[in-house]
């Protein structure tokens, strides 16, 4: 029997053209592709027609598969000789639970390759005209998640003034609470802030305001998941650098 293996592939942020060369190579080798909600469906066409495709997407309040079931599927199919590609939006090791899946493989003795992807923590702001660092404006940035499995969130008040630019992934669900906590931790109420939804797709939208008014501005145009929050002086640069129209690919939902 041919030795199987697992390849954790970062799909990048929305646009299928932003996957890495190694990512496309891995898909071409696949016997099974286990893919997430935020990975562009167009990437599935890069796998052989004979390859099995299994949806394992997660979204607020529901999941197609439990994490334990995903881990077990990867290990089982690789042990049976398959090349299993685990396709994840962004980068698998940036709030993508890729580390858990890699550990499951390692503990089961299954070879596992990691193919990094372009993380939305940097790409979503960039695609909206916001650099996360900029000379003499922002020399540091931090990335946190706005959504956790058990409600044990990040202490944003403690982090508020520790970095120039703060990026919050999965930010839409608790946007008002996040902005309030950052203000409570010492960020200025009038500090520039932006939220970017569906980055890298034709449905990309962004709203720019301040920490004080961004929640209301976002609610007024029904910004929802998936969305990335950017807080810091660099957010104001979107007024000059944002593209006139989204440059990406439509993602069927």
At which residue positions do the language-model features occur?
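A contiguous loop/helix-start segment that scaffolds small-molecule binding in enzyme catalytic cores
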Residues: 3-8, 79-84, 97, 140, ...
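Short, flexible, glycine/charge-rich loop motifs used to bind or transfer phosphoryl groups or to couple energy/partner
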Residues: 21-24, 42-44, 74, 131-133, ...
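Class I SAM-dependent methyltransferase SAM-binding "motif I" and its flanking Rossmann-like core
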Residues: 91-162, 205-208, 253
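Short beta-strand/turn micro-motifs composed of small residues
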Residues: 35, 88, 116, 145, ...
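Class I S-adenosyl-L-methionine
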Residues: 1-16, 21-115, 214-215, 224-227
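Short hydrophobic/aromatic-enriched beta-strand-loop microsegments
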Residues: 51-58, 109-113, 132-142, 186-195
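Hydrophobic packing residues within well-ordered alpha-helices of enzyme cores
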Residues: 43-44, 105, 124-125, 178, ...
């Amino acid at each position: 029997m041919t030795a199987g293996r697992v390849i954790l592939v970062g799909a990048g942020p929305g646009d299928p053209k932003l996957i890495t060369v190694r990512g496309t190579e891995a898909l071409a080798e696949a016997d099974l592709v286990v893919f997430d909600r935020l990975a562009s469906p167009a990437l599935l066409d890069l796998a052989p027609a004979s390859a099995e495709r299994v949806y394992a997407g997660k979204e607020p309040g529901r999941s197609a598969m439990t994490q334990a079931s995903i881990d077990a599927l990867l290990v089982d199919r690789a042990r049976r000789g398959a090349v299993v590609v685990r396709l994840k939006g962004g980068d698998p090791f940036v709030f993508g639970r890729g580390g858990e899946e890699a550990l499951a493989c390692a503990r089961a003795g299954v070879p596992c390759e990691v193919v990094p992807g372009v993380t939305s923590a940097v790409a979503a702001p960039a695609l909206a005209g916001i650099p996360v660092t900029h000379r003499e404006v922002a020399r540091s940035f931090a990335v946190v998640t706005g959504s956790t499995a058990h409600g044990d969130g990040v202490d944003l008040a403690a982090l508020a003034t520790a970095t120039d630019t703060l990026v919050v992934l999965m930010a839409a669900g608790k946007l008002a609470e996040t902005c309030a906590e950052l203000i409570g931790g010492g960020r200025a109420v009038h500090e520039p802030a932006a939220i970017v939804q569906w980055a890298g797709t034709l449905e990309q939208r962004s709203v720019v305001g301040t920490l004080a008014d961004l929640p209301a501005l976002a609610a007024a145009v029904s910004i929802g998941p998936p969305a990335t929050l950017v807080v810091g002086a660099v957010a104001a640069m979107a007024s000059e650098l944002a593209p006139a129209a989204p440059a990406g690919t439509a993602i069927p939902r």
